[in-house]
Design a protein with these regions (language model features):
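Catalytic alpha/beta core domains of metabolic enzymes, predominantly
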Residues: 1-101
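C-terminal extensions of enzymes
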Residues: 99-166
Length: 166
């Protein structure tokens, strides 16, 4: 089997983080358990659509914010990026059973609630929910970009301070 030469990443945890903030900001009454599943539901759809259309493209699950962003991906032919502190260390500590959760069907009631109550879930989940020109301004993408930019600027600042001490 040849490894993929092209990969794409779904920012599962950042997507959940954004939706949680959107629900709080807009006063959306939605179950925390439903929100907990949102990013994984989108990841499953993106994964399956891509595997059907372009089976050689690899999948990376990124932006993990909780253990579920790793454990719910078990069974997928995917690479998952996680932090050591708060994720990898907790997985080692809890040693949960290894169960293929990725191929479990999505609960239709959960999907319906997300599609009905969360506009940016619907936009990210539905085919053609956002257009290419809208992508850059899509809330979860902005959150990812802004988080990355902030962390990069902090790294540059730290490097500059350390060089100044030499």
């Amino acid at each position: 089997r040849t490894a993929p030469v092209v990969y794409f990443s779904h920012i599962t945890g950042i997507y959940d983080e954004y939706l949680g903030k959107q629900a709080a900001r807009e006063g959306i009454d939605i179950s925390p358990d439903t929100l907990w599943q949102a990013g994984i539901i989108v990841a499953k759809k993106a994964y399956h659509l891509t595997k059907r259309a372009c089976p050689a493209v690899g999948f990376i699950g990124g932006g993990a914010r909780g253990l579920q962003h790793f454990t719910e991906m078990v069974g997928a032919n995917a690479c998952i990026t996680i932090n050591w502190q708060g994720t990898a260390d907790k997985l080692l500590e809890t040693n949960p059973p290894v169960v293929d959760r990725f191929h479990a069907p999505v609960d239709e009631a959960v999907l319906d609630e997300l599609l009905t109550k969360m506009p940016d879930f619907r936009r990210g989940y539905m085919l053609n929910g956002i257009t290419p020109p809208e992508y850059e301004g899509f809330g979860p993408v902005e959150l990812f970009r802004d988080s990355f930019t902030s962390a990069w600027e902090n790294a540059r600042k730290l490097a500059k301070e350390r060089r100044a001490k030499q």
